[in-house]
């Protein structure tokens, strides 16, 4: 275990999840995909060198999955969006005296414990910021803040460059780590295609849900 480094995972309620995937999957399949991706992420985190895992959610199934993998569940600002949910976890971890927070989204099913370890290994002495960009180099898919409140985070489709600029404005040169698993978040139909084509092939729970969903869409009525 790495003392003081906690994973922080914000999870929206699964009902109505992943609306942008409507052309590919039914509402029920999108909910199943959200749950499968979260479990893929939690499984990787549970095997990584972390002091603990915190999940911020109000979803009953997400709560059940989090507890199954030994995560601490909180609900502060859980319905206020990704940014507010992460900020709430950062405040909690800072108040508890934790050394660092590694925030990871719940929709990166190809993440591995080895990738998480690589992010942790790349961090510099505090104050520091380590960031893994999305594959399009626009989003911030994982951010390691040391200490947890080293700077405010603001997530969205174009958060990567603003996070770099914000760190530098505070005199912190961010460490950038490019990782294919963490870099592939599943939000758009082309992300699904990228997941299905990705090599080496991983038998993720998310891929199984997608394969079944696409097969159902393509089968004759």
PLM features: residue spans?
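Conserved donor-nucleotide/metal-binding helix-loop-beta segment in metal-dependent transferases, i.e.
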Residues: 111-137
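Conserved alpha/beta core of the MobA/IspD/sugar-nucleotide pyrophosphorylase nucleotidyltransferase superfamily
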Residues: 166-220
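Short phosphate-binding loop-to-helix
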Residues: 67-100
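N-terminal nucleotide-binding beta1-loop-alpha1 segment
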Residues: 1-21
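A short, N-terminal amphipathic alpha-helix
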Residues: 34-50
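Short, glycine-/small-residue-rich phosphate/pyrophosphate-handling segment
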Residues: 145-167
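Acidic donor-binding segment of Leloir-type glycosyltransferases
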Residues: 50-72
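The conserved acidic donor/metal-binding loop of glycosyltransferases
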Residues: 105-109
């Amino acid at each position: 275990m790495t003392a003081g480094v906690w994973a922080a995972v914000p999870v929206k309620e699964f009902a109505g999840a992943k609306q942008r995937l409507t052309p590919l999957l039914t509402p029920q399949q999108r909910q199943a995909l959200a749950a499968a991706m979260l479990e893929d992420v939690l499984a990787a985190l549970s095997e990584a060198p972390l002091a603990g895992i915190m999940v911020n959610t109000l979803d009953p199934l997400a709560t059940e999955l989090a507890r199954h993998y030994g995560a601490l569940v909180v609900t502060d600002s859980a319905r206020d969006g990704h940014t507010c949910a992460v900020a709430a976890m950062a405040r909690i971890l800072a108040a508890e005296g934790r050394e660092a927070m590694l925030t990871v989204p719940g929709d990166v099913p190809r993440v591995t414990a080895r990738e998480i370890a690589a992010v942790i290994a790349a961090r510099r002495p505090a104050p520091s910021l380590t960031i893994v960009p999305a594959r399009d180099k626009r989003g911030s898919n994982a951010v390691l803040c040391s200490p947890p409140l080293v700077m405010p985070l603001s997530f969205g489709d174009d958060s990567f460059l603003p996070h770099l600029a914000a760190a530098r404005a505070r005199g912190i040169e961010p460490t950038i780590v490019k990782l294919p698993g963490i870099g592939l978040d599943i939000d758009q139909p082309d992300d699904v295609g990228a997941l299905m084509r990705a090599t080496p092939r991983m038998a993720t729970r998310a891929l199984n849900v997608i394969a079944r969903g696409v097969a159902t869409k393509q089968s004759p009525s």
